[in-house]
Amino acid sequence: MKRPDYRTLQALDAVIRERGFERAAQKLCITQSAVSQRIKQLENLFGQPLLVRTVPPRPTEQGQKLLALLHQVELLEEQWLGNEQGTDTPLLLSLAVNADSLATWLLPALHPVLADLPIRLNIQVEDETRTQEQLRRGEVVGAVSIQPQPLPSCLIDKLGALDYLFVASPEFATRHFPNGVTRSALLKAPAVAFDHLDDMHQAFLQQNFELSPGSVPCHIVNSSEAFVQLAKQGSTCCMIPHLQIDQELKNGELIDLTPGLCQRRMLYWHRFAPESRTMKKVTDALLKLGRQMLRQDDIN
């Protein structure tokens, strides 16, 4: 059985996390040449490349498996050894979450964990359709995802749903939809997407108004909070979680353009198994507040 030296795995992990050899060397307090040597040693052990040397570097499939192994071992070491090794370094937890969860319920959910445990979060923001891939690649130890099936050797729990409403300011609605929300008006109304892969707005219009994907002009803005600001100032119409704009809907700053219609995204919490004590506390905190704040109609 091939047993890697964990110093070599930590070098591989550092190159991925720091997005390059130079910063990885600084992080590990060794030379860049030493980082390269450790990774080469690991690649020689397994007889195959473990890094795709692009900018930034990314792990191969075998590299992903080794990173996942490293992260699981680190969590289990924390569980069984605790701080017996005399280090005051907080445990690093890398989590992949969608921007809308981060802007609404996730940080309040993690508050008691951060207050109680010596951990350091590395939150990586990604669309909920793609966060599970980061877990698969070993880049994170937990992910909020819409995928209902767990990866091999992973655990999953249903959190609840975010309901997205199609909203705009009253002034925007008067200007762009004087005769109501129609197909012809939608083709001219400015909208916004999180990135070029964000298809929620287009999917909603296709499902409810039979508009083909790509037919509506969209700004690209990588910020959940900016969606709210753009809508409130009358610049765009957009899909925003009801949870995020409850107050704006109540005070009239925003209006629901299509009452009775919404785009629902059921969210799941994925993480590696077995679960360490620290990850169990993270899981319990996310499930507790997530199930209080997210829609639960479809929870079995």
Curated annotation (Swiss-Prot):
Name of the molecule in the record: HTH-type transcriptional regulator ArgP
Keywords: DNA-binding, Transcription, Transcription regulation
The gene coding this protein: argP
Family label: Belongs to the LysR transcriptional regulatory family.
DNA-binding region: 21-40
InterPro entries for this protein: ArgP, ArgP_gammaproteobact, LTTR, LysR_subst-bd, Tscrpt_reg_HTH_LysR, WH-like_DNA-bd_sf, WH_DNA-bd_sf
Pfam families given in the database record: HTH_1 (PF00126), LysR_substrate (PF03466)
Residues annotated as domain HTH lysR-type: 4-60
Quaternary assembly: Homodimer.
Role noted for this protein: Controls the transcription of genes involved in arginine and lysine metabolism.
NCBIfam families: argP, PRK03635.1, PRK13348.1
A single MF term (Gene Ontology): DNA binding
